[in-house]
């Protein structure tokens, strides 16, 4: 076994721990924040960088995506005397677990002739919407977003409940025109711009086969789940983002409440932001 220290005890690090192959044995996390030392993340102890290297691990994996930060962390590890291999999870920029799962679900939906449109709530600049549009070239895709960032009423709930540090206007660096240019089949897209659920009225008679819910915050996620779930075809899927992450815990709260009410068991996806699948029986 290759004993490994994961440097960076955050959301990314927790997912890297789950993605490590069977040849690797994670001994601990290392982190520069003293407040995390002596705690556990994903059941793995968190130590200072100095303490993490004392057992002489075989390798260190840097749990950050930012290249500048990764360079700083690598220099720190070398300065502490570690001479072994240092891994950078750059492949995760190329291979996307959530997109792969969505494509597999789309293939299954086509094979089983599950009827319904596609949709995404929380479009931002359209990267994932473009993937869905490509996977369902002959189906309508409904796209819901304020296209102006987080609205004040939703952010207020986040702050009052301590769900996140969201700010009004976050993720506002977008526009419908930007998204349209990214879609491979823009003629199949129907845009619903504004604050959800007020923008859902035109879809009350719609049926869905696959819906991506990526609203980040508690209130819009809680509002979206029953509206889309009740309109899913049998075998249809909700793919919900940020459920098992640490940046936006309100989305996870909304999903857990909804699943308890409906008697559902969410199926986790091993992507970087803790997505889950909810499938209609």
Show which residues each predicted segment covers.
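Hydrophobic, well-ordered beta-alpha structural blocks that scaffold small-molecule cofactor pockets
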Residues: 1-115
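S-adenosylmethionine/decaboxylated-SAM
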Residues: 88-93, 103-107, 111-281
């Amino acid at each position: 076994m290759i004993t490994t220290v994961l440097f960076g005890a955050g959301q990314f690090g927790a997912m890297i721990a789950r993605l490590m192959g069977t040849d690797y044995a994670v001994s601990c996390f290392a982190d520069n924040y003293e407040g995390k030392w002596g705690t556990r993340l994903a059941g793995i102890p968190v130590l200072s960088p100095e303490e993490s290297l004392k057992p002489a691990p075989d390798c260190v994996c840097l749990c950050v995506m930012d290249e500048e930060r990764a360079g700083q962390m690598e220099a720190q590890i070398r300065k502490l005397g570690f001479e072994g291999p240092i891994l950078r999870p750059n492949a995760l920029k190329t291979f996307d677990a959530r997109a792969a799962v969505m494509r597999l679900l789309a293939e299954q939906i086509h094979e089983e002739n599950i009827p319904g449109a596609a949709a995404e709530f929380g479009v931002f600049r359209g990267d994932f919407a473009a993937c869905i549009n490509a996977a369902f070239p002959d189906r309508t895709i409904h796209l819901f977003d304020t296209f102006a960032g987080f609205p004040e009423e939703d952010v207020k709930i986040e702050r009052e409940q301590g769900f996140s540090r969201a700010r009004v206007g976050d993720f506002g660096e977008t526009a419908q025109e930007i998204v349209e240019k990214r879609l491979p089949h823009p003629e199949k897209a129907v845009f619903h711009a504004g604050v959800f659920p007020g923008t859902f009225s035109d879809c009350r008679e719609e049926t869905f086969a696959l819906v991506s819910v990526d609203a980040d915050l508690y209130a819009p996620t809680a509002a979206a789940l029953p509206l889309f779930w009740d309109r899913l075809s049998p075998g249809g899927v909700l793919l919900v983002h940020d459920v098992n992450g640490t940046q936006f815990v309100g989305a996870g709260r909304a999903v857990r409440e909804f699943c308890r009410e409906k008697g559902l068991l969410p199926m986790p996806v091993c992507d970087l932001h803790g997505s889950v699948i909810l499938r209609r029986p």
